[in-house]
Amino acid sequence: MDEVLIGEVIKPHGVQGEIKVYPITDNPKRFRKLKEVILVQNQEQRRLKVLHANVHQSEVYLTLEGINTRDKAEAIRGWAVKADRDQVPPLKEGWYYFELEGMQVYEGDVLLGTLAQVIQTGANDVYLVKGDKGEICVPALKTVVKHVDVAGKRMDVELPPGLIDGEELR
Protein backbone atom coordinates (compact mmCIF):
# COMPACT_ATOMS: atom_id res chain seq x y z
CA MET A 1 0.00 0.00 0.00
CA ASP A 2 1.23 3.51 -0.78
CA GLU A 3 2.25 5.62 2.18
CA VAL A 4 2.02 9.40 2.39
CA LEU A 5 4.21 11.64 4.56
CA ILE A 6 1.88 13.68 6.77
CA GLY A 7 4.14 15.05 9.49
CA GLU A 8 7.06 14.71 11.88
CA VAL A 9 7.19 13.99 15.61
CA ILE A 10 8.40 17.21 17.24
CA LYS A 11 8.50 16.28 20.93
CA PRO A 12 6.65 14.59 23.79
CA HIS A 13 3.71 16.45 25.28
CA GLY A 14 3.01 15.69 28.92
CA VAL A 15 3.99 12.55 30.81
CA GLN A 16 1.57 9.96 29.40
CA GLY A 17 3.13 9.50 25.96
CA GLU A 18 1.23 12.08 23.93
CA ILE A 19 3.34 13.50 21.07
CA LYS A 20 3.33 16.85 19.29
CA VAL A 21 3.42 16.46 15.51
CA TYR A 22 4.42 19.04 12.92
CA PRO A 23 1.73 18.54 10.26
CA ILE A 24 2.58 18.70 6.56
CA THR A 25 -0.84 19.90 5.48
CA ASP A 26 -2.80 23.11 5.26
CA ASN A 27 -5.65 21.39 7.13
CA PRO A 28 -4.41 19.79 10.39
CA LYS A 29 -7.99 18.76 11.26
CA ARG A 30 -7.44 15.83 8.88
CA PHE A 31 -5.46 14.15 11.68
CA ARG A 32 -8.68 13.65 13.66
CA LYS A 33 -9.87 11.04 11.15
CA LEU A 34 -6.73 8.89 11.23
CA LYS A 35 -7.13 5.36 12.54
CA GLU A 36 -3.47 4.40 12.22
CA VAL A 37 -0.10 6.01 11.51
CA ILE A 38 3.25 4.66 10.40
CA LEU A 39 6.30 6.01 12.21
CA VAL A 40 9.49 5.81 10.16
CA GLN A 41 13.14 6.47 10.94
CA ASN A 42 15.93 5.14 8.72
CA GLN A 43 15.02 1.49 8.02
CA GLU A 44 12.76 1.11 11.07
CA GLN A 45 9.02 1.35 10.64
CA ARG A 46 6.25 1.03 13.27
CA ARG A 47 2.52 0.88 12.55
CA LEU A 48 0.51 2.25 15.49
CA LYS A 49 -3.18 2.73 16.18
CA VAL A 50 -4.25 6.34 16.84
CA LEU A 51 -6.10 6.39 20.16
CA HIS A 52 -6.74 10.15 20.20
CA ALA A 53 -5.94 13.14 18.00
CA ASN A 54 -6.18 16.67 19.37
CA VAL A 55 -5.87 19.62 17.00
CA HIS A 56 -5.50 23.16 18.31
CA GLN A 57 -5.12 25.74 15.52
CA SER A 58 -2.11 24.43 13.55
CA GLU A 59 -0.79 22.17 16.33
CA VAL A 60 -1.44 18.42 16.34
CA TYR A 61 -1.17 16.13 19.36
CA LEU A 62 -1.48 12.36 19.00
CA THR A 63 -1.92 9.55 21.52
CA LEU A 64 -0.72 6.30 19.98
CA GLU A 65 -1.16 2.73 21.13
CA GLY A 66 2.00 1.51 22.87
CA ILE A 67 3.42 5.00 23.43
CA ASN A 68 2.25 5.57 27.00
CA THR A 69 5.19 7.21 28.77
CA ARG A 70 7.23 10.33 28.19
CA ASP A 71 10.34 8.18 27.64
CA LYS A 72 8.63 6.19 24.86
CA ALA A 73 7.46 9.45 23.28
CA GLU A 74 10.97 10.90 23.54
CA ALA A 75 12.35 7.81 21.75
CA ILE A 76 10.34 8.67 18.60
CA ARG A 77 11.25 12.37 18.48
CA GLY A 78 12.17 13.32 14.91
CA TRP A 79 10.50 10.29 13.32
CA ALA A 80 8.47 10.79 10.16
CA VAL A 81 4.72 10.29 10.47
CA LYS A 82 3.08 8.59 7.50
CA ALA A 83 -0.39 7.28 6.71
CA ASP A 84 -1.72 4.80 4.21
CA ARG A 85 -2.86 6.66 1.13
CA ASP A 86 -6.45 5.44 1.57
CA GLN A 87 -6.58 7.39 4.86
CA VAL A 88 -5.68 10.66 3.12
CA PRO A 89 -8.86 12.46 2.07
CA PRO A 90 -9.13 13.35 -1.62
CA LEU A 91 -8.56 16.89 -2.75
CA LYS A 92 -11.45 18.84 -4.25
CA GLU A 93 -9.42 19.57 -7.36
CA GLY A 94 -5.88 18.96 -8.56
CA TRP A 95 -3.08 16.76 -7.22
CA TYR A 96 -1.23 16.07 -4.01
CA TYR A 97 2.22 17.61 -3.78
CA PHE A 98 3.83 14.20 -3.29
CA GLU A 99 2.37 13.10 -6.64
CA LEU A 100 4.04 16.01 -8.44
CA GLU A 101 7.45 15.90 -6.77
CA GLY A 102 9.88 13.78 -8.75
CA MET A 103 8.13 14.35 -12.09
CA GLN A 104 10.18 14.99 -15.20
CA VAL A 105 9.34 18.46 -16.53
CA TYR A 106 9.46 19.04 -20.29
CA GLU A 107 9.00 21.98 -22.61
CA GLY A 108 8.26 20.32 -25.92
CA ASP A 109 10.86 17.57 -26.31
CA VAL A 110 13.39 19.30 -24.04
CA LEU A 111 13.82 17.95 -20.51
CA LEU A 112 14.07 20.95 -18.17
CA GLY A 113 14.66 18.83 -15.08
CA THR A 114 12.93 17.18 -12.15
CA LEU A 115 10.22 18.84 -10.08
CA ALA A 116 11.99 18.98 -6.72
CA GLN A 117 9.61 21.02 -4.59
CA VAL A 118 6.20 22.66 -4.58
CA ILE A 119 6.42 26.13 -3.02
CA GLN A 120 3.28 27.77 -1.67
CA THR A 121 3.42 31.51 -2.31
CA GLY A 122 -0.09 32.60 -1.42
CA ALA A 123 -1.11 33.74 -4.90
CA ASN A 124 -0.28 30.50 -6.72
CA ASP A 125 2.06 27.59 -6.15
CA VAL A 126 5.48 27.55 -7.79
CA TYR A 127 7.28 24.39 -8.93
CA LEU A 128 11.03 24.31 -8.28
CA VAL A 129 12.57 22.38 -11.18
CA LYS A 130 16.18 21.22 -10.86
CA GLY A 131 18.05 20.34 -14.03
CA ASP A 132 21.62 19.68 -15.14
CA LYS A 133 22.10 23.39 -15.87
CA GLY A 134 20.46 24.84 -12.77
CA GLU A 135 17.10 25.57 -11.19
CA ILE A 136 14.02 27.37 -12.44
CA CYS A 137 10.81 28.34 -10.70
CA VAL A 138 7.78 27.45 -12.81
CA PRO A 139 4.49 29.15 -11.87
CA ALA A 140 1.70 26.62 -11.33
CA LEU A 141 -0.72 28.29 -13.72
CA LYS A 142 -2.95 26.73 -16.38
CA THR A 143 -1.33 29.02 -18.94
CA VAL A 144 2.08 27.50 -18.13
CA VAL A 145 1.39 23.89 -17.08
CA LYS A 146 -0.13 22.30 -20.18
CA HIS A 147 -0.34 18.64 -19.18
CA VAL A 148 0.31 16.48 -16.11
CA ASP A 149 0.62 12.70 -16.35
CA VAL A 150 0.70 11.51 -12.73
CA ALA A 151 1.07 7.82 -13.64
CA GLY A 152 3.82 8.56 -16.17
CA LYS A 153 5.56 11.07 -13.84
CA ARG A 154 5.69 13.70 -16.60
CA MET A 155 4.70 17.37 -16.73
CA ASP A 156 4.60 19.41 -19.92
CA VAL A 157 4.97 23.18 -19.65
CA GLU A 158 5.11 26.20 -21.92
CA LEU A 159 7.35 28.73 -20.22
CA PRO A 160 6.54 32.42 -20.54
CA PRO A 161 9.10 34.54 -22.42
CA GLY A 162 11.87 35.84 -20.17
CA LEU A 163 11.49 33.19 -17.45
CA ILE A 164 14.87 31.71 -18.30
CA ASP A 165 17.86 34.01 -18.77
CA GLY A 166 19.59 33.34 -22.06
CA GLU A 167 17.72 30.08 -22.63
CA GLU A 168 20.48 28.21 -20.75
CA LEU A 169 18.23 25.42 -19.47
CA ARG A 170 16.67 24.55 -22.84
From Swiss-Prot:
Binds ribosomal protein uS19. GO terms for molecular function: ribosome binding. Coiled coil: none annotated. This is Ribosome maturation factor RimM. GO terms for cellular component: cytoplasm; ribosome. Residues 92-163 form the PRC barrel domain. InterPro entries: PRC_barrel-like_sf (IPR011033), PRC_RimM (IPR056792), RimM (IPR011961), RimM_N (IPR002676), RimM_N_sf (IPR036976), Transl_B-barrel_sf (IPR009000). It holds the Pfam family RimM. An accessory protein needed during the final step in the assembly of 30S ribosomal subunit, possibly for assembly of the head region. Essential for efficient processing of 16S rRNA. May be needed both before and after RbfA during the maturation of 16S rRNA. It has affinity for free ribosomal 30S subunits but not for 70S ribosomes. GO terms for biological process: ribosomal small subunit biogenesis; rRNA processing.
